[in-house]
């Protein structure tokens, strides 16, 4: 049901440009244009996609063999940051070994969204990251988002932790999420993973939403088979 169109080319100055457009279920889904300027970084012009820049690229960086522990559940949007992906401009580059990126979009209601993200590998097998965004879309519809965490890889095992805070201008709407996960490559074809996510809602009457899941993937040549087994308790803070 998905049809994608892609194209790329190199300009006379050595820079490369690439484009994609995705049609899903017979309608427009996303499109993007990327200008790779080499050592000067890259610029993206996206609609419906993150383009790898800004906070949208750090929605969830935890290791998994299939789906994240919170995915495909009734409360999957709870505690998960949502970067605005509508008609946005992004830029990314490398500074002193750190990958730095920003993005910005102007919204139709007069508001705007902008974000900054940084990730850094201080040593082999270790990656740490932090990202922050603010979005103004009118009274009681604005929010600030922050996420940070890290992963560590030793041999065939990768473990990670990520913490996300969503501060909404509406009353009693803030959410904080902690996600831990681990993956293990049994061999070059088979991988397994486990994850657990807890969402803390603002409001004394709400309980913590607890998500957990197990994933597995198996690759045979160019084909991959994946499966996820996820469960959730206290969805939306209600038992």
Go through the PLM ranges and name each one.
Residues 1-239:
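Outer-membrane beta-barrel proteins
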């Amino acid at each position: 049901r998905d049809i994608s169109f892609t194209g790329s080319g190199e300009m006379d100055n050595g820079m490369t440009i690439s484009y994609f457009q995705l049609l899903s279920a017979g309608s427009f889904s996303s499109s993007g244009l990327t200008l790779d300027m080499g050592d000067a970084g890259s610029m993206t012009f996206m609609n419906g996609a993150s383009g790898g820049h800004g906070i949208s690229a750090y929605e969830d960086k935890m290791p998994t063999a299939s789906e994240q522990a919170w995915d495909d559940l009734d409360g999957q949007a709870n505690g998960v940051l949502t970067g605005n992906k509508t008609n946005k401009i992004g830029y990314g580059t490398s500074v002193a070994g750190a990958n730095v990126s920003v993005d910005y979009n102007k919204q139709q209601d007069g508001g705007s969204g902008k974000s900054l993200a940084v990730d850094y590998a201080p040593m082999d097998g270790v990656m740490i990251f932090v990202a922050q965004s603010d979005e103004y879309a009118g009274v009681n519809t604005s929010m600030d988002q922050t996420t940070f965490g890290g992963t560590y890889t030793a041999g065939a095992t990768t473990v990670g932790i990520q913490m996300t805070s969503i501060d909404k201008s509406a009353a009693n709407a803030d959410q904080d999420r902690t996600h831990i996960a681990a993956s293990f490559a049994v061999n070059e074809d088979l991988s397994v993973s486990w994850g657990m996510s807890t969402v803390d809602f603002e409001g004394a009457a709400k309980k913590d939403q607890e998500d957990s899941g197990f994933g597995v993937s198996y690759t045979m040549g160019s084909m991959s088979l994946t499966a996820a087994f996820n469960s959730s308790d206290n969805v939306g803070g209600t038992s």
